[in-house]
Structure formats: C-alpha cells, structure tokens
Amino acid sequence: MANEFRVCDDCDATNLKTLLPRLKSVDPDAKIEIGCQSYCGPGRKKAFAFVNNRPLSAPTEDELLEKVQKKVK
C-alpha cells in the first residue's frame, strides 16, 4: 500500500511551497491530498501533516520531516 500525505492549504504554520517538495522527496510515489484537515488548533502554531491517517506536528518543518520519515512505509 502506498503512503498518503494530507496537508492543509489554509493553516498559518504550514508552508506548502516548501513542505510539498520535501514530502515528495521522502516518497515520490505517495498520494498527496491538499485541503482542510480539521486540525486548525495545532495548525495555527505548528507545522503538521497527516501521514497514513496519523497526525504529526512539530514546531518546525525540519522537525516535522524527521517524524514523517519515521512513519512512512
């Protein structure tokens, strides 16, 4: 089963211009969904992504990517 990343295009702490290429570098074949994830509270203050339906967040995008790499299949 392929990995799936879900990210929000409206949350303040998520910069899609930098995050999407980095997620694609982790798994170029992963499915990526962009849209509201109903994760607005944490999304205001921390970078986040859902990886295979599991929410991951971190104070910085670099820290988030470290967590993402541990969760991909």
Curated annotation (Swiss-Prot):
InterPro entries: DUF1450, UPF0741
Organism field: Bacillus pumilus (strain SAFR-032)
Domain of life of the native organism: Bacteria
Protein name, as recorded: UPF0741 protein BPUM_3395
Pfam families given in the database record: DUF1450
Family under the similarity heading: Belongs to the UPF0741 family.
Paired cysteines (S-S): none
